Structure formats: C-alpha cells, structure tokens
A protein has these predicted regions:
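Exposed alpha-helical structural elements
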Residues: 51, 113-114, 137, 165
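Acidic, Ser/Thr-rich peripheral helices and adjacent loops at domain boundaries
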Residues: 104-119
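Polybasic low-complexity intrinsically disordered regions
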Residues: 1-89, 93-95, 100-102, 106-107, ...
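Hydrophobic alpha-helical segments with strong N-terminal bias
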Residues: 8-10, 32, 55, 118, ...
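Basic, amphipathic alpha-helical segments enriched in Lys/Arg and hydrophobic/aromatic residues
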Residues: 123-186
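Short alpha-helix boundary/capping motifs
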Residues: 80, 111, 172-173
Length: 186
C-alpha cells in the first residue's frame, strides 16, 4: 500500500523521492468462504515470516486450521513451528537454494522430506500434488483490496490500521453478498 507516495508522472519527470514510505499488508483468508480472517499492517522493513504467528493468533484457538498455504518467504523453522503448534499442515515450497535442516523436530523432518520430494519429482508436479494453487486465492483477495484503493489517506499508523480494517470489513461484506449459495436437491 502506498503511503506518502508520489504520482507516476512526477517520478518520471523528476526522479524518485528517497523518503518514500510503504506499508505492507499481510492477510489470511478462509479458503472455503473467501473471508479475510486475519490482517496485519506493517512497515516496509518487517519481513513476511515475522508476522505469521500474529496472523494465526487472530484466529481463535478453538477454530481448527486445516492447512496454511504460503510462499517460499515463509520457509523458516519458526514459521513451520508456528503452523505445527496450531496442528495445521504447512504447504510451503522450499526456497530455490534450500538445504536440509539438521535438527530432528517433526516440522524439520517433514520439510526435509518435502525437499527430497521436490528434488525428485520437480517443483511443478509438487505444486499440483499439494494443492499449492490455492494460495492464489490470497493474491486474488489482495487485488480486490487494491481495487478499493492502493493508497492510504491516513497519516498516523493507527489511523492507517483503522482504514485498512474498514476496507476489509467492506470487502468481507461484498464477498458474503456476492458468493453463490448452491443447494443440491434430490
């Protein structure tokens, strides 16, 4: 999300400004209902993997999480442990230069087995087999959020968080109203 950004024309004519600031939006969705269930707005110097625990903690502990689909930026021991702590299945592709982990935790052993499988079968086949394509639902939802505006009007960080939460509430309501309700009658 752009914050205190500048227009394309100004950037082309005068060059980029060096004090540009960005906010990163991290979301978690329910793949069945397509509702945004977890949201975190951070500054541009916070990595994706640092907020995974906060995102999962926004979902009540008594609600079951089946699987967590993420990109390779989340291929860390900490992220896999956070997912395992919620008794969920981690669907995270190993990084391109991934090496086996030496510890004997179950999440590390599972990741090492995944690494062997990807090397043996190939990344494309693993993505089809694992259902990794479901991660694109989040990318689609991010696109929908940006359709409501890719810039933040608020100046203070707290107000920006409120602005994002308002957009997400509107988008969740749109999603609820726009989803078809299918019933099969015998």
């Amino acid at each position: 999300m752009k914050f205190l950004g500048e227009g394309e024309w100004k950037r082309k004519k005068h060059g980029p400004e060096y004090r540009r600031q960005w906010r990163k939006l991290h979301i978690g969705i329910d793949a069945k209902t397509l509702q945004i269930r977890a949201i975190q707005l951070t500054t541009n110097n916070v990595s994706d993997s640092q907020v995974l625990g906060d995102l999962l903690n926004q979902i009540p502990q008594d609600e079951r999480i089946d699987s967590v689909y993420t990109d390779g930026a989340y291929d860390t021991k900490q992220c896999r442990q956070v997912i395992a702590d919620r008794q969920a299945h981690a669907v995270i592709p190993p990084r391109k230069n991934a090496k086996p982990w030496k510890d004997t935790k179950s999440s590390s052993l599972e990741r090492n087995e995944l690494l062997r499988t990807v090397k043996r079968l190939g990344r494309t086949l693993w993505k089809k087999w694992s259902g990794y394509h479901r991660r694109s639902l989040v990318e689609t939802k991010m696109h929908c959020i940006k359709l409501l505006g890719d810039k933040l009007s608020a100046r203070s960080f707290g107000s920006q968080v409120n602005e994002i939460h308002a957009r997400v509430a509107v988008l969740n309501r749109f999603t609820e109203l726009g989803r078809p309700l299918t019933q099969v009658t015998p």
